[in-house]
């Protein structure tokens, strides 16, 4: 199969390129050329420079690809504007299959959710497409109008794994590896779910060659781990590498909120109880039926920790609000 990847040098898109190559597919990657990371520039990859949000640029860049070796499928990993969806719908209309990486943020009532399955309502066209969730919902509709049942919209959940430069999972690893004591929310038994970037990328490549259509919640199964399980995996990964690991200091959510601790940003992945009770409840029965794998969180965390050792990722100082001395 000849796969056209929109993106190719980023977190998910780089992994999609790697997965496609390792399955023996030919890859053309479209980027603006801002990230000189391996992937799209590997010799087996045809690298095309264009801003995918610009229909004229995308059409012009795509013309020689179409003339030489028409792609069998698109995997769209950089849909960040509705104009970008329109540009792809126009420039790539003749490609037989389109897999769009959307987000569970497309759901109108998430958070707090729950999202039992893909029939839950998404944002309507009245919602501002300047915002991420409405933009994803609107982009899905634009692409569905163009590609119909040739479109699969993979509504990704939280993507984690090696190469993740968002300061979420890596922030926990960094804190645990560099402090003596680390404040954590005392919500250890709350179920949480993530999707490993390698599981998602490999599956997107399979999806590009399948005849699946419509939306699918592309994340880990409800209850795949808990908040405490994720933190324990971080601690275990640090300890297994021979580094000292911090003592975890659980603080009840009410005390955290009283102290002005910002959910999610100060303590990554932490949501207040009323939101957490439903926000992590995203039904993934269809993804499981379609074979989206879900490796153990311990494997994801261990590999992320190994990657972090050489990633040169700068971590901001831990906010004073979550200094353990404030909760003594
Ligand atoms: N990270 C998550 O937890 C999460 C959760 C749900 C959904 N998603 C979705 O997953 C997808 C991938 O996310 P990611 O963070 O892993 O992104 P990514 O793969 O790092 O995407 C960035 C890639 O796309 C290229 N790119 C970005 N804008 C472009 C443009 N206008 N024209 C051409 N190329 C462009 C970048 O190269 P250049 O900069 O060189 O152009 C880079 O290769 C996104 O659609 C995101 O909305 C992510």
Report residues per predicted region.
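Conserved beta-loop-beta element that borders a ligand/cofactor-binding pocket
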Residues: 102, 140-163
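N-terminal Rossmann-fold cofactor-binding loop
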Residues: 30-34, 52
């Amino acid at each position: 199969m000849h796969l056209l990847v929109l993106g190719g040098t980023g977190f998910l898109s780089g992994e999609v390129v790697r997965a496609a190559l390792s399955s023996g597919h030919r890859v053309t990657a479209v980027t603006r050329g801002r990230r000189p990371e391996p992937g799209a520039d590997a010799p087996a990859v045809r690298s095309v420079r264009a801003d995918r949000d610009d229909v004229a640029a995308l059409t012009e860049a795509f013309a020689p690809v179409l003339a030489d070796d028409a792609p069998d499928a698109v995997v769209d990993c950089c849909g960040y504007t509705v104009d970008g969806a329109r540009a792809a719908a126009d420039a790539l209309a003749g490609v037989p299959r389109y897999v769009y990486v959307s987000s569970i943020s497309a759901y109108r009532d998430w958070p707090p959710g729950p999202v039992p399955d893909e029939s839950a309502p998404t944002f309507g066209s009245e919602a501002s497409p300047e915002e991420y969730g409405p933009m994803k919902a609107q982009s899905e509709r634009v692409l569905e109008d163009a590609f119909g049942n040739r479109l699969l919209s993979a509504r990704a959940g939280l993507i984690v794994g090696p190469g993740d430069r968002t300061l979420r999972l890596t922030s926990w690893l960094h804190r645990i590896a560099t402090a003596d004591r680390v404040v954590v929310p005392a919500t250890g038994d709350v179920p949480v779910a993530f999707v490993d970037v390698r599981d998602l990328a490999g599956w997107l490549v399979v999806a590009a060659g399948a005849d699946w259509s419509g939306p699918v919640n592309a994340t880990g199964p409800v209850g795949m781990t808990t908040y405490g399980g994720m933190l324990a995996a971080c601690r275990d990964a640090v300890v297994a590498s021979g580094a000292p690991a911090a003592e975890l200091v659980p603080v009840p959510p009410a005390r955290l909120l009283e102290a002005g601790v910002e959910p999610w940003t100060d303590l990554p992945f932490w949501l207040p109880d009323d939101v957490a009770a439903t926000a992590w409840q995203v039904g993934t029965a269809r993804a499981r039926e379609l074979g989206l794998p879900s490796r153990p969180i311990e494997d994801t965390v261990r590999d992320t920790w190994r990657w972090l050792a050489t990633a040169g990722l700068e971590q901001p100082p831990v906010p004073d609000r979550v200094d353990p001395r404030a909760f003594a």
